Amino acid sequence: MRATAIVLLLALTLATMFSIECAKQTKQMVDCSHYKKLPPGQQRFCHHMYDPICGSDGKTYKNDCFFCSKVKKTDGTLKFVHFGKC
């Protein structure tokens, strides 16, 4: 009984550690692949939920929509630095 409890506790601990690592990995980059480059003069309408992203140009973007729009506009020269303010 005691050995079963220890094995179960160990399995639960490992599962928790792996799920935390997976959650960290999913939010280490911004995926701009689903944003298309717009024709000249056309604007993208982005939601205004604040989830800041720091770009390689030293600017803080409100969220992934604003950041990815700029990435597409610059043909990929703008790079992701980190989540949060610059």
From Swiss-Prot:
Gene Ontology MF: a single term: serine-type endopeptidase inhibitor activity
S-S bonds: 32-68, 46-65, 54-86
Tissues expressed in: Skin. Highly expressed at sites of hyperkeratosis. Also detected in thymus, tonsils, testis, pancreas, liver, placenta and brain. Expressed at stratum granulosum and stratum corneum at palmar and plantar sites (at protein level).
Subcellular location: Secreted
GO CC terms of this entry: extracellular region
Keywords: Disulfide bond, Protease inhibitor, Secreted, Serine protease inhibitor, Signal
Domain Kazal-like intervals: 26-86
Assembly and oligomerization: Dimer. Interacts with KLK5 and KLK8.
Protein name from the UniProt record: Serine protease inhibitor Kazal-type 9
Lineage: Eukaryota, Metazoa, Chordata, Craniata, Vertebrata
